[in-house]
């Protein structure tokens, strides 16, 4: 373990606490940020690959390139706060899996709003002795350049190691063809095959599956009812989820850690690999050469010690998210700073940076399961007597071909009804939640999540048993429009002293969002009545957190008005790559992470083909 006080585990190591957890912590102790004159043994300011951001996309690049022999450094503005598994999902604790509504507070605590208009409310009841402002306050992240009528008010970011994957839903559907960007021009079959190949690999990294909730009573109640109601019209299935069921009562949700464990290398498990993670480090500038054809350095600042240095690498990869990738590029001379002015000529470097941005519309409601559905749970049971009385019994006939439910279902119900005779519901307390979807299709061009999960909104009050609740979230697409922009101030900085992001966005008109709302209302009524306070509603713009198109992908920079090619390489620069949802140039309604990961895998294939890893000086002893 490093003796440097800048090591996040420094204070911890000085204590007398020597539990297994403490001993385990030493295995991934982090080196201090390397600077000239104080390099720890084996460290340098030069790497093969420098990655900005530690979410699933950054971890995809890290995994692919580290395993290919490259010496990789990863820089993350946030810190490690997800326990001993670096960048792991915070829902992987028994506490939150027993009470999902408690996890809402975790999400709310992690999210940081991107752009908040200045609060113009005046406090006119202050004491005359108190200092009073003559203009509006601009602290607490307020952005005086943000027009509240053109804001993505719900848009937020998560600044921790692992990014949003430390609290996401883990929904990883593939994009249907109408949502997908092209990777192969003029050959539909080849494009389909390429996407299938990339999706399969991405799904293996995330451990995506569709059977983790196959033995959930609530899941099957909702799924079977909707399949029955929409037979021959719509297809329903489990949401594709990046998760692994460990037991009937515990699911391990995937995250950045699942893709790549973020442990420094070499280590005993990977003695021939090279990787270092540097948390609490802000990347402030990517340095261009005089010819504007290559990146020659990455300026970073240690947020603890305040030291700034320049990192050298052969390849530079930005995976800090749709907002922060564009923010770093704008601060580095790409695109332009300041409010966009149509009268000015387009900038020479990445003229379409931050244009054509997209975000999904979101409608939401919650329903309480119908009496019909709850009564159907015990359809195969023979119930004698009253609960709490000596003669009370619940039985069924295993293997009876006339049973409406499988034996696993009936056994769970019988056991619960006998063990918990005080409970008016026949559904076991630890029955997994529903996770149902009807996927995007041309006739219904929206994505659906019919489930029970924690978001920054939608918690259930204590007076309602959450086993009865079903959440309905329908996500609509937005056509990319050049006038919908994300731009960065030339005057104001954010809390991290980086250029303040500002949105100039409005959802395009049309009937699609209203049709989606109608579809949700009709469908949800088949499951039950609305939960008071959670009636069907449109949610704040940006609350979906699926911002896309900030640095669009295409085949030709001018013709497609984009920033990167289909290998995610920035146009005009041979060694600068961008990863994440900001690359996706299409109107999409589904969760975009799996698609962004697939693009990162393709990008890694290009890097491995066009760059060589440096010789590995580490000596290995057998």
Curated annotation (Swiss-Prot):
It is found in: Periplasm. Its main location: periplasm. The modification Tele-8alpha-FAD histidine is found at residue 167. GO terms for molecular function: flavin adenine dinucleotide binding; pyranose oxidase activity. InterPro entries: FAD/NAD-bd_sf, GMC_OxRdtase_N, GMC_OxRtase_C, P2OX, P2Ox-like. Keywords: FAD, Flavoprotein, Oxidoreductase, Periplasm, Signal. Its cofactor is FAD. Residues 1-28 form the signal peptide. Binds 1 FAD covalently per subunit. One of its GO terms (cellular component) is periplasmic space. The keyword Oxidoreductase applies. Substrate binds at residues 449, 451. The active site is at 546 (proton acceptor), 591. It is an enzyme of class 1 (oxidoreductase). Its EC number is 1.1.3.10. Residues 29-37 form a propeptide. Catalyzes the oxidation of various aldopyranoses and disaccharides on carbon-2 to the corresponding 2-keto sugars concomitant with the reduction of O(2) to H(2)O(2). Plays an important role in lignin degradation of wood rot fungi by supplying the essential cosubstrate H(2)O(2) for the ligninolytic peroxidases, lignin peroxidase and manganese-dependent peroxidase. The preferred substrate is D-glucose which is converted to 2-dehydro-D-glucose, an intermediate of a secondary metabolic pathway leading to the antibiotic cortalcerone. This is Pyranose 2-oxidase. It comes from Trametes hirsuta.
């Amino acid at each position: 373990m490093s003796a440097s006080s800048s090591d996040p585990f420094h204070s911890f190591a000085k204590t007398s606490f020597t539990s297994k957890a403490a001993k385990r912590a030493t295995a991934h102790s982090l080196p201090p940020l390397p600077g000239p004159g104080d390099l720890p043994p084996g460290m340098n300011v030069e790497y093969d690959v420098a990655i900005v951001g530690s979410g699933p996309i950054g971890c995809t690049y890290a995994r692919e390139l580290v395993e290919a022999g490259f010496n990789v450094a990863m820089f993350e503005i946030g810190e490690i706060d997800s326990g001993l598994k670096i960048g792991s999902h915070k829902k992987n604790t028994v506490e939150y899996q027993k009470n999902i509504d408690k996890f809402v507070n975790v999400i709310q605590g992690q999210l940081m709003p991107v752009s908040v208009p200045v609060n113009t409310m005046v406090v006119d009841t202050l004491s005359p002795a108190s200092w009073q402002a003559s203009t509006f306050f601009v602290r607490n992240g307020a952005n005086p350049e943000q027009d509240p009528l053109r804001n993505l008010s719900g848009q937020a970011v998560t600044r921790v190691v692992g990014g949003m994957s430390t609290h996401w839903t883990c929904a990883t559907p593939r994009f249907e063809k109408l949502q997908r960007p092209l990777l192969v021009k003029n050959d539909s079959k080849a494009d389909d095959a390429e996407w299938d190949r990339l999706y399969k690999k991405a799904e293996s990294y995330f451990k995506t599956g569709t059977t983790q909730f196959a033995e959930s009573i609530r899941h099957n109640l909702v799924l079977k009812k909707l399949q029955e109601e929409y037979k021959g019209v719509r297809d329903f299935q489990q949401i594709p989820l990046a998760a692994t069921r460990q037991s009937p009562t515990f699911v391990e949700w995937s995250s950045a850690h699942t893709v790549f464990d973020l442990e420094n290398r070499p280590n005993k498990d990977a003695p021939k690999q090279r990787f270092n993670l540097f948390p609490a480090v802000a990347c402030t500038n990517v340095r261009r050469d005089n010819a504007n054809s290559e990146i020659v350095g990455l300026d970073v600042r240690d947020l603890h010690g305040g030291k700034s240095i320049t990192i050298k690498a052969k390849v530079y990869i930005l995976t800090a998210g749709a907002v922060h990738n564009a923010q770093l590029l704008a601060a580095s001379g790409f695109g332009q700073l300041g409010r966009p002015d149509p009268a000015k000529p387009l900038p020479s470097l990445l003229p379409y940076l931050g244009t054509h941005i997209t975000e999904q519309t979101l409608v939401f409601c919650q329903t309480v399961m119908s009496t019909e559905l709850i009564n159907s749970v015990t359809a195969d049971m023979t119930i004698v007597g009253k609960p709490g009385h000596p003669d009370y019994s619940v039985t069924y006939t295993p293997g009876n071909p006339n049973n409406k439910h499988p034996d696993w279902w009936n056994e769970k119900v019988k056991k619960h009804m006998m063990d918990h005779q005080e409970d008016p519901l026949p559904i076991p307390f630890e029955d997994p939640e529903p996770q149902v979807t009807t996927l995007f299709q041309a006739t219904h061009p929206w994505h659906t999540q019919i489930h029970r999960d924690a978001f920054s909104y939608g918690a259930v009050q204590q007076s309602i048993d959450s086993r009865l609740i079903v959440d309905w979230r329908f996500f609509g697409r937005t056509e990319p429009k050049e006038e919908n922009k994300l731009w960065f101030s030339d005057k104001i900085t954010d809390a991290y002293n980086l250029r303040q992001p500002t949105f100039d966005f409005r959802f395009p008109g049309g009937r699609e969002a209203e049709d989606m709302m109608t579809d949700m209302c009709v469908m949800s009524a088949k499951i039950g009545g609305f939960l008071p306070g959670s009636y069907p509603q449109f949610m704040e713009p940006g609350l979906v957190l699926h911002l896309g198109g900030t640095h669009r992908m295409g085949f030709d920079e001018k013709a497609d008005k984009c920033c990167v090619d289909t290998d995610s390489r920035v146009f005009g620069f041979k060694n600068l790559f961008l990863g994440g949802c900001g690359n996706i140039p299409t109107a999409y309604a589904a969760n975009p992470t799996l698609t962004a990961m697939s693009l990162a895998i393709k990008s890694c294939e290009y890097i491995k083909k066009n760059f060589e890893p440096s010789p590995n000086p580490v000596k290995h002893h057998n």
